[in-house]
Amino acid sequence: MWWWRRRFWRPKRRWRWRRRRRRPLARRRRRPARLARRPRVRRRRFQWGRPRRYRPRRRRRRRKRQKIKLKQWNPAVTKFCRIIGYYPLIICGEGTTVRNYNVHSQDYVQYESYGGGMTTTMFNLKVPYEQFQLHQNFWTRSNIDLDLVRYHSVKFTFFRHPKVDFIVKFNRNPPFTDSVLTGPMLHPGVLMNSKRKILIPSWETRPRGKKRIPVRIGPPRLFTDHWYFQRDFCGVPLLTVNATACNLRYPFGSPQTKNICIYFLVLASIYNDKVSIAKDEVTKNYDTLVDAIKKSPQGLTVFNTFKTQEHMQEPSSETCKETQKTNPPFKYENLSSLWGDKIYKESTFNSFKTNAENLWKARSKHTLLGSKELNFKTGMYSAIFLTNGRLSPDYPGIYIEVVYNPLLGQGEGNMIWLEWCPKKTKQYNERQCYNLIQHVPLWAAIHGYMDFCKKTFKDNNLDKNTRVVLICPYTRPQLYNPQKPDWGYVPYDYNFAQTKMPDGNGYIPEFYRFRWYPSGFHQQNWMNDLDQCGPFSHRGEEKMATLTSKYNFKFTWGGNPIFQQTVKDPCKQSTFDIPGAGGIPRPIQIVNPKYLDPGITFHRWDLRRGFFGPAAVKRMQAESTDALFPTTGPKRPRTEVPVAVAGDALPSRERKRQAWQDSTSEETESEAEAQEEKTLQEQLQQQLKEQRQLRCGIQYMFQQLTKTQLHLHVPPIPQ
C-alpha cells in the first residue's frame, strides 16, 4: 500500500521573525461619477389602449423645527470639580432587618444593634459638603467666591460583601418623596420582580466576577441644564438611592431552620374594648378585666403559669436552714397546678389586686410615676396573663398563639395600621388610625413601616406611644372576625410576654416598671421576624453587614471673582526636617454652598479704580457672622427622603399627649393656660414682629419672582 510509509506527525516547523504587516490607511471612498441623463424621446402610443397612469411625485418640503436651542454664556471663571468619597449605604446589625438605616444613622447605641436592613437615601449638594466636614471625601477644586454651579452626573461604585447580598435601585424621577408603600416595594421579595434593579451578589453567592459594580447616573428627569446659584441649588434633590439586604442563596428559607412558618402572640378578644391606657380609662379597664377573667370559663386557670409565683411572692431574705425530709408517702390525693391540673389557689387570685395596690404605694415615692394598673408584676399586661409558659398547655391564658405561612399569604384582605395607645378599642377608624396598608402580604407591609411612621409624625419616640394593629385571614387561627370585620388584633413579642426587654434583658428599667403595656417598642422582634420570613429576605445571621459605596459627583463652579495672589518672602518661610514633610497636607478650602450668597461675595465689577465701591462695602457689612461658628448637627439626617404627606400629621396635640401624666402635670397645664392679658406694649411688640416677618416674606417672594423671570430659578424642593 502507498500509505504505510506515510508520516502521521507534522514535521518540525521553523519559526521565523516576520516583519509586521503595515496596515493601509483608511481611504475615503469617492462618490462615483454621475452618469449623463438619458435624452427624452417621444414615442407614439397605440391610440386604442388606455393611457398610462403615473404616480404623482411628492416633493420634499422643509419641515418646521419643533424646538429651538437656548444658549447661555458661561461666566468669566469656570472650574470643573469632582467630589469623590465613600459612603455606607447600609449598616445592618443583628435583628434590624425591618428598620431603615437612614433613619437610624445618627443614633447613639451602646449595647443594642445598630442600623437597618434597608435604606432610602437622597443626595443633594448639601450631602457632599457634610461628608467633607466629616473627612469622608475630597474636592478637586475649591468653590470659594464662585457662586454659580452646574451639575453633570454621578458615578456610584458598589463593593461586594463576603456573605451578604444586596439589591440597589435608583430614582431620578421627581417628586423625590416617600409614601406608605415605599417600604413594601423595597422588600427583596417584591424588588426581585421589578425592573432596572442592580444585584450585588456576595462572594459566597458568586465566587468569581468583578470586585466592584460601577453604575453611572445622569441628572434628574425634567432637569434644565444651566447655571444656578449654589445657595438655591444646594437643596435640590439630585437622585434617591434605595437599597436593601437580601439572600440570593437561600431565598425561601435558611438552612439553619427546619420551618419557614413563624408564630407569634396576640391579645385575646377579652381586650377588645380594654386596650386604652388613658388615666381615666385604665382603672376601669383593670377592674373589668379581673372580673371578666374570674367569670370566664377559664377562671382560675389563667394563673397557671411559671411566672405567677415569681410575680406574686416576694423574694425571701432569710438564709435557708437544713430541715428534715417531710415527703409524705402518699401523693396525688389533691389537685395541684404543679402537676398540670387546671386548678390554682383561689387565695392567689383574690390577693392579685391587693398586691398591685401594695406595689404602687411602696414604690410611688421612689420611682418614676406611671400607672399602678400598668405595673410589670401584677398589671393588665403582666406575664401572668400573656405568657405562653404554661404549667399545663391545655389551659391557655388570655392570648392567642398564631402561626403564619408566608407562602400562603395572598395579601387580599390584609390590613395594618397605627393607632395611639390611649385609643379605647381596636376597631379601625379613619380619624384615629394612621398609615393604613391593605391588600399587601404581611411580610412586605411591615418592611420599614415603623420608621416611615416616625418620619410622618417627626417623632423618634413614636414607638413608645403607639401600637401596630393588623387583620389577616391567612393565619391559623384567622386574625379576622366575620361578625366584626373592622376589629383588629394587637401582636406582641415573646420577650414582652415573659416580662423582658426587647433585647432579652430580664432587668426592667424604672421608666418601664409602671408603663408596661404593648406598644411598638415591644413589637420590634415580632416585626423583624415577620419581615425575615418573606422570600429573598435577609435572615440576619451576621452580626453586622455593610454595603460600602464610592461616589464621584461632577460639578462645575462658575463666577466672576476678584483675582487674589498671596506672595510671601521665601527667606522667611518655615523649615522642616525633611523638605515637603510638613505633616498632614492642608485640603482644599471649601465653603458651605448654603451660605455662598452672591450678595455677600466680592466680584470684579465691585472694584472702582482699585478700590471697592460704597455699594459693595455696604452690602458686605450686612453679612451675618452666625454661619461662621460651628453648630450642632441636624435633627434629621441630610440624606433622609421627605414624606409625601402634606400638612401636619398630628391633627391635635391631645393625641400626642402621654396618657400616664399625673395630676401634677395637669395642674401645671391649667396654670399655663390661665395667663393674664397682655399689656399694650407687648401687643405692639408682637405686631411689630409679625410685620417684620411679613416684610421678609414679601422680599423673598419678589426675589424668587425676579429669578424666575431671568430663568435662574431652581426646581421645586420637597419639604
From Swiss-Prot:
Its main location: virion. The keyword Hydrolase does not apply. The keyword Zinc does not apply. It is found in: Virion. Keywords: Capsid protein, T=1 icosahedral capsid protein, Virion. Residues 664-674 have a biased composition (Acidic residues). InterPro entries: TTvirus_Unk. Residues 647-678 are annotated as: Disordered. GO terms for cellular component: T=1 icosahedral viral capsid. Coiled coil: none annotated. It comes from the Viruses. Self assemble to form an icosahedral capsid. Belongs to the anelloviridae capsid protein family. This is Capsid protein. The lineage of its organism: Viruses, Viruses incertae sedis, Anelloviridae, Alphatorquevirus, Alphatorquevirus homin6.
